From Swiss-Prot:
Gene source species: Neurospora crassa (strain ATCC 24698 / 74-OR23-1A / CBS 708.71 / DSM 1257 / FGSC 987)
Keyword tRNA processing included in the entry's annotation: no
Residue ranges, Extracellular side: 234-244, 536-1065, 1114-1116
GO cellular component term, pick one: prospore membrane
Annotated Pfam families: Chitin_synth_2, CHS4
GO biological process: ascospore wall assembly; chitin biosynthetic process; protein localization to bud neck
Composition-biased stretches (Low complexity): 648-665
EC id: 2.4.1.16
Cell location: Cell membrane
Residues carrying covalently attached carbohydrate according to the record: 639, 1034
Biased composition (Pro residues): 1-11
Protein name listed in UniProt: Chitin synthase 4
Record's compositionally biased regions (Basic and acidic residues): 94-107, 169-187, 549-558, 1220-1235
Keyword Nucleotide-binding attached: no
Length: 1235
């Protein structure tokens, strides 16, 4: 955050850092330069640095730590002073926090919000310590003085009160600053309006994106008027349809590419390989000539000596019709390649009978006889019938062989054949040469070089050096190369067993894909086991109200999930129960009446030395441990939200002449008292948690069991509060009362009578007139009911708040008034937390929420660190909340987590039965694997937990997580005009929130905690399942498209979460094609032989590993049966549901998932705009301004504050009911409480 820091090294922050100036520079007033972001303000203390808007396009940016810099590092690049061609200074390597950032930067909105917070610089460079401040001057820069008489003697030694004059001066300076901001804002508003008018005047349409051009090209065959005829008259509907067709075309292309790689790539690059016959396996129907096999079974030789004509008049077949059978023999010497490369090397011997011409061409080199293919034939120099018999030297005979016959196969040698010691073989340029054939030379007929003899004789050194090897590289000299090329023509007997480049590439692609898929599958399995056996245990609480025997606990959970209304095996007992005063049966006033401190109690709570070293930091433990720092200082040096809520000046007094009754008016007498900060019933410091329940159309039984399960969790009631947000006044299908009325009946001890609660305005996540919405805030405590199954002695007092979105008066007559969607319900809380943390302007609704939480808990809302999000039809196991908070507290880097969701209606129908194992695998395989890297991509909205803020760096420093402005800003996006945004924000808002968290904080963790369990009912009708999975699949695709672009996730290249996300995205898109290919491979493997082993092995691994996971993780054996049911339903999961979801890309409704009374189906969802938004209907002020107005009104009705104080007695007449815990009793004068 934009806060002063302690000197020395500190861990890196996600937020921008503030660098201190030197003391001399700090003592000088900053220059009045708008570019630097500073400007002196009238009436402002020199120690207070206030930022003013810049004239640049970034009106609110971080100020430069150096006043001499030319401009703000966040401001856009200015135009050159001399546009005459002088080159501008290029970007250089600078600090990350000084980089220029755009709106796409993950921390853009956070830096803007942090830049608006006041910063009090330290004169020493250290955090301000209160004892030092007591003796210091008001002006930390040393330009002013302070009167000790201004400090009240009755105030605690940590407090410092300003005089009345200082308060007036502070208010004047604040008014002056507000006037300046208003003037600057107006100025900027005029600029924006002028530029907007200029754009409208130009009349230019926005340039269509490449995506829109592509979608238009794909759907050119369907013009707009045709779509109007098919029920799509609006441009938004037509655009969504065209984008859907564009996405489907891309999906088909990806499917085609996967199919091509699987089946077609080998056929294209390798083709059908020619027939190849291994040496010594050439059949009797072939003869070998120069390394190629010829099928001569149907050939006929012209009549010749020794080859008579057959009775049918045809020539004899040399394979079968002759006395000597030549089938399977090598006849290379019958058609010798002469007078080529060997000319000049092999010459005629004197007195030779070999015919020749004047050019030295010879008729043959070897005797014209055949030899065996295995090399066992001895040289045969006999000549039957006549000289040149069977040498085929005539042109007719040569043409008949070379032109008339086609080789049927290539004869190949493996390297084992080549290295066979019984043969004398070498390889040259891929051809196998038989050196033993050189023995067939008739020395009386021809002459040849002595080198021939050296190479053919096995006992020579030359032969031993090359036999059985490839001599291509060795025979590169001109003489040796000529000899090798000669051998290639006359003694070639075959070729090496090699493949073409295409076939090699095909195998490379096949095996790389195989290794990649196997690596991913096995890595997911192994790492999921490692998480289950080792990592997950570090997250769990050491002890809870349930059994510590893991096997017994698993059995109890399985029994508990058999029925949605079944009670847990054991209700919370002594372990985890709150301190005295938390039970409904105890006195409501005991905690406020009995003293909790004596004169011997330390003013700072528990001594720091009593705390165990290395304990995690929480809001409660931090404020108790800070002996020197102000207990209320949460964000350091006046930037804490609570103190800024209650004082307009960081060092000013909490009172002013206009003060009236304190915040919230009073604190409920039945508030659960806060235990000591060192009380750790579960072995870790407790953290305050908001249990958010979003309700829509649930019935009484569903809501009752949900709230019962949350109220009866063993986590202390002092540190949890139930917040129910009803999404409109909705009556569920078949219900007598609306959901808000049902939930209101589950509350008691209201702070304000329900009939007196008024609706308050807020800015909803919608467009048009729906952006203005109204809601009512009901606060009190949870009522278990008169007929509750929970024993009275077990019922604990749990504070509860309900926010009912009732809508504006204009929509009171509509079917679903106030309904804005679940995302809007979540934004109500997230925006409220952000404004509490940053002390920003809030709506009337948020102001009432602030006061309501104060009334029923006795603590400020900024004490809450964690939010549990639960749907109103989800039931939580008693110790689940404890396990989840344990993980959050033990590891501050965890920003979100989820538990396991189990199905309570397993046997309702075949539809629910096929989902059991799918839920199991998604948690214990997918989420467990992702948890190893801290990157769970989907935290289910029905049961998950997020961190509101996290401790960072030195003590009293916190950074917003869920309350981060970037998360809130993107999640509250109301301009949903593209198919991508609609699938993200209207259908899968829960998953998109997980994506936003990972995108904003890629270095933090989102994990799965298997010890936390909930149960819910799943669709038991196929059409409802179809509608639900349509939303989930489409949301998954679009969220993975967002997440695959995040480059800062864990890992690098193939060993990264980004790569895994990309694999998941492609796998989701090709699911229909994958299941079709699987069936094809299985059928082909059954029909044809041999079967395709590799695809079958992959299929067995993918389907079989989850079964092994069930066994080794000691889960119920019943999941084996559920697995077989799941395997039988694979066509539904992988073909029917994805295909339907793809075709319904442009359907943004929730379909049949949750029915309401009188609801009509609509494809638009909550994104449909109606009317225009009137912002004047919504009042936004800072909390202090709201509280000042309320106190003025209270003073008007109740009389002056002095009369009230004199009637009660003491310096603080409102302190008789101060809440105990977290040392609030000692610094309660920070709050204007009149409890």
């Amino acid at each position: 955050m934009s806060l002063p820091r302690r000197p020395g090294p500190s861990p890196p922050h996600e937020e921008p850092r503030r660098y201190r100036q030197s003391g001399s520079r700090r003592s000088r007033p900053p220059p009045a330069d708008v570019e630097t972001g500073y400007a002196p303000m009238a009436g402002e203390r020199p120690s207070q640095q206030q930022r003013v808007p810049s004239i640049s396009s970034f009106p609110e940016t971080l100020p430069s730590p150096n006043p001499n810099v030319e401009r703000d590092p966040l401001a856009p690049t200015p135009e050159p002073a001399h546009p005459s061609g002088i080159p501008q200074r290029k970007r250089s390597l600078i600090r990350p926090e000084r980089n220029r950032i755009g709106k796409d930067h993950p921390n853009y909105h956070y830096r803007k919000h942090a830049a608006n917070m006041n910063t009090l610089p330290s004169s020493t460079g250290h955090d301000p310590i209160y004892e030092d401040l007591e003796g210091a001057t008001d002006d930390v820069s040393g330009t002013g003085s302070r009167n000790d008489d201004d400090v009240s003697e009755e105030s605690p030694p940590r407090r410092k009160h300003s005089t009345k004059m200082q308060v007036i001066e502070t208010e004047k300076s604040g008014d002056e600053r507000r006037r300046r901001r208003k003037s600057d804002t107006t100025k900027h508003g005029k600029i924006v309006k002028a530029s907007k008018g200029k754009r409208e005047k130009s009349g230019g349409l926005p340039t269509p994106s490449f995506w829109n051009i592509y979608c238009g090209f794909v759907t050119f065959w369907c013009p707009g008027f045709v779509l109007k005829c098919f029920g799509m008259p609006e441009m938004a509907q037509q655009r969504a349809w065209r984008e859907k067709m564009g996405l489907i075309s891309i999906i088909l292309l990806i499917m085609g590419f996967v199919g091509f790689i699987t089946f077609g790539f080998t056929q294209v690059v390798c083709g059908k390989p020619p027939l190849r016959l291994r040496i010594n396996e050439v059949g009797s129907g072939y003869m070998i000539f120069h390394g190629s096999a010829y099928d001569l079974t149907k050939s006929h030789h012209p009549p010749a000596e020794g080859i008579p004509r057959r009775p049918d008049g045809l020539g004899a077949n040399v394979i079968y019709d002759l006395p000597q059978h030549y089938g399977g023999q090598d006849g290379s010497f019958l058609f010798q390649n002469v007078n080529g490369k060997c000319k000049g090397l092999i010459t005629k011997q004197e007195n030779s009978d070999v015919p020749s011409d004047k050019s030295g061409n010879l008729a043959w080199y070897f005797p014209c006889n055949t030899f065996n293919q295995d090399g066992s034939s001895k040289p045969n120099t006999t000549i039957p019938y006549y000289l040149g018999y069977a040498c085929h030297t005539t042109a007719n005979a040569r043409d008949s062989f070379y032109l008339g016959l086609k080789s049927s196969a290539d004869v190949y040698f493996t390297w084992d054949d080549i290295k066979n010691s019984s043969r004398n073989l070498v390889v040259y340029s891929g051809h196998v040469l038989d050196l033993d054939l050189l023995h067939w030379f008739n020395d009386t007929q021809v002459t040849y070089p002595a080198r021939f003899k050296e190479l053919r004789d096995k006992n020579t050194a030359g032969n031993q050096a090359i036999r059985g090897r490839d001599i291509t590289h060795a025979f590169q000299s001109s003489k040796d190369k000529q000899i090798a090329e000669c051998f290639e023509e006359i003694i070639k007997v075959g070729s090496v067993d090699t493949e073409t480049v295409g076939c090699i590439a095909s195998k490379v692609v096949l095996y790389v894909s195989l290794v990649l898929i196997l690596a991913v599958v096995l890595a997911r399995f192994v790492l999921a086991l490692i998480f289950q056996w080792f990592i997950s245990k570090t997250y769990a609480a050491a002890k809870t109200s349930q059994t510590s025997d893991q096997r017994k606990r698993n059995r109890q959970i399985e029994d508990w999930t058999e029925d949605i209304y079944r009670a847990p095996p054991r209700l919370p007992g002594e372990v985890g129960s709150s301190v005295a005063g938390s039970s409904d049966r105890q006195s409501k006033r005991s905690s406020a009446f009995l003293p909790t401190h004596s004169r011997f109690s330390t003013v700072y709570g528990n001594e720091r030395g009593n705390r165990k070293p290395g304990l995690p930091t929480t809001m409660a433990s931090q404020n108790a441990a800070g002996q020197l720092l102000h207990p209320g200082t949460i964000y350091g040096q006046g930037n804490e939200s609570r103190s800024s809520f209650l004082k307009s000046d960081a060092y000013g007094s909490s009172s002013s002449p206009a003060d009236g009754p304190g915040p919230a008016g009073f604190i409920h007498e039945a508030v659960v008292p806060q235990p000591p900060s060192d009380w750790m019933p579960f072995g870790f410091p407790l953290a305050h948690t908001i249990c958010l329940v979003t309700a829509y159309s649930e019935g009484e039984m569903g809501v009752r069991t949900t709230l019962d399960s949350i109220a009866m969790t063993d986590y202390p009631n002092s540190h949890k509060v139930i917040l129910v947000i009803c999404d409109g006044i909705i009556k569920g299908h078949g219900e007598e009362h609306s959901t808000p009325d049902i939930i209101l009946g589950m509350m008691k001890d209201h702070t304000i009578h329900p009939d007196d609660v008024e609706p308050f305005s807020y800015v909803a996540v919608a467009t048009g007139s729906k952006r203005h919405n109204m809601a009512k805030v009901y606060t009190g405590f949870y009522d278990y009911g008169t007929n509750s199954a929970i024993p009275l002695e077990k019922q604990q007092r749990v504070p509860m708040m309900m926010v009912v979105k009732c809508g504006t008066p204009a929509e009171a007559s509509k079917s679903k008034p106030g309904n804005r969607g679940k995302r809007d319900s979540q934004i109500i809380l997230m925006s409220f937390l952000q404004k509490v943390m940053f002390d920003e302007r809030m709506t009337e609704l948020e102001y009432e929420m602030f006061n309501g939480l104060w009334k029923i808990t006795g603590i400020s809302p900024d004490f809450y660190e964690i939010v549990l999000m639960v749907d109103a039809d989800t039931k939580v196991f008693p110790d689940s909340l404890t396990h989840m908070i344990s993980a959050m507290v033990k590891d501050p880097e965890i920003m979100g987590l989820c538990g396991e969701t189990k199905i309570a209606n397993k046997r309702a129908s075949w539809v629910s039965a096929i989902q059991v194992f799918e839920y199991f695998v998604s948690h214990h395989l997918a989420k467990a694997f992702e948890s190893v890297f801290g990157g769970v991509t989907c935290l289910p909205g029905c049961f998950c937990m997020y961190r509101i803020k996290a401790p960072k760096g030195a003590q009293n420093y916190w950074v917003p997580i869920l309350a981060n402005p970037d998360v809130v800003e993107h999640y509250s996006e109301n301009v949903v005009d593209t198919l991508h945004k609609k699938n993200l924000l209207l259908l899968g808002e829960d998953r998109y929130l997980s994506t936003l968290m990972l995108r904003t904080f890629p270095k933090r963790k989102q994990v799965f905690v298997p010890q936390a369990v909930c149960k819910t009912t799943v669709p038991d009708e196929f059409m409802v399942l179809l509608s639900q999975r349509r939303r989930w699949i489409n949301s998954t695709i679009h969220n993975l498209m967002e997440l695959v672009l995040v480059r800062d996730l864990c890992g690098t290249f193939c060993f990264s979460m980004q790569f895994i996300v990309g694999i998941e995205l492609i796998g989701t898109l090709v699911l229909p094609a994958a299941i079709a290919f699987t069936f094809y491979v299985v059928i082909i493997s059954i029909i044809n032989s041999p079967p395709q082993i590799i695809p079958l092995v992959l299929l067995g691994l993918i389907l079989g590993l989850p079964a092994i996971l069930v066994v080794v993780t000691a889960h119920s054996w019943s999941y084996i049966i559920w697995m077989f049911i799941y395997l039988l339903s694979l066509p539904v999961w992988n073909f029917v549901l994805p295909t339907y979801a793809f075709w319904k890309f442009d359907d943004f409704s929730w379909g049949d998932t949750r029915k309401t009374a009188g609801e009509k189906s609509s494809k638009g969802g909550h994104g449909e705009a109606e009317g225009e938004f009137d912002s004047s209907m919504i009042t936004m002020k800072r909390w202090a301004e709201f509280e000042r107005d309320r106190r003025v009104r209270s003073t008007y009705w109740a009389g002056s504050r002095d009369n009230v104080i004199s009637g009660v007695g003491g310096s603080n007449g409102w302190g008789s009911s101060q809440p105990r815990g977290h040392e609030q009793g000692r610094h309660f004068d920070d709050y204007f409480s009149d409890a």
